[in-house]
Amino acid sequence: MRRYSRIIGTGSYLPPRRLTNADLVAELGQRGIETSDEWIVERTGIRARHFAAPDVSSSDLALQAARLALQAAGLQATDIDLIIVATSTPDMVFPAAACILQNKLGANGCPAFDLQAVCSGFVYALSVADSMVRAGAANCALVVGAEVFSRILDFNDRTTCVLFGDGAGAVVLQASATPGILCSDLKADGKHVGILCVPGNVSGGQVLGDPVLKMDGQAVFKLAIGVLEQAAHAVLAKAGLKPADVDWLIPHQANIRIMQGTARRLKMGMDKMVVTLDQHGNTSAASIPLALDHAVRMGRVKPGQTLLLQAVGGGFTWGAVLLKL
């Protein structure tokens, strides 16, 4: 009998501190940086974001999302036999945030590791977890995207600091006799390393050089729309499906213009896209599971529907996962 994996529970968490565009405009104004709510909304679609308190780490956010996902799945932490955390902002250089999360959950003993593919991280992690479940290396996986991007933002650069927020999203993936995760497609192209990066070097546990995010927005935009379309068509071809067969498109919540451009290329209406970007900004690896959980809890995304998840991130990395909920 063939073995598959299926999502049986979702969860998400946003830290309490919520900054609207007006709040951020006021804070930046104190630094002599000019921007406006209109400028931010027009260019990004973002209206608010959440920032974690200084003593809150990625694993803390991951813990809250993981508990909700386990609750939704009707499982205990001890039922989990694999933990993968997608993050670019781990608690420390090592050990992995996944190991720290494992201890906080009380799920000690199972394999636990981090996966770093920036904003593509959750799609990568979900694909890896699916492969391990299909291979029999795990029966019940916890896959989390968690980020505290507020720690690596340059608040003197209005083109980047308005984009990102902190948060976490999680899913529980369980072995199944019927297909849940249908297929995935992952890609990377290292020649684009410099267009989205934190260029500092880590030495002795300290970041040397430039420790804040740098982005060539125009280059990212042009590349993102093309590779997202490629990834979507790749997974659809593997499954023998067409865009019209997809009930919901759940993209990385990066920028509304990128999301609209992708929908146009796939000839899918925005009414079939889950959009939560306006309320939490770009939360990197956390954005897709955040959007998925929100849509599930709102009753928009329902069991049996076909979902297309797609992401693009620094590296340059990109990918897509096609699944039935």
UniProtKB/Swiss-Prot annotation:
Signal peptide: none annotated. One of its GO terms (biological process) is fatty acid biosynthetic process. Keywords: Acyltransferase, Cytoplasm, Fatty acid biosynthesis, Fatty acid metabolism, Lipid biosynthesis, Lipid metabolism, Multifunctional enzyme, Transferase. Residues 253-257 are annotated as: ACP-binding. Its EC number is 2.3.1.180. The active site is at C119, H252, N282. It is found in: Cytoplasm. Homodimer. This is Beta-ketoacyl-[acyl-carrier-protein] synthase III. It comes from Verminephrobacter eiseniae (strain EF01-2). The lineage of its organism: Bacteria, Pseudomonadati, Pseudomonadota, Betaproteobacteria, Burkholderiales.
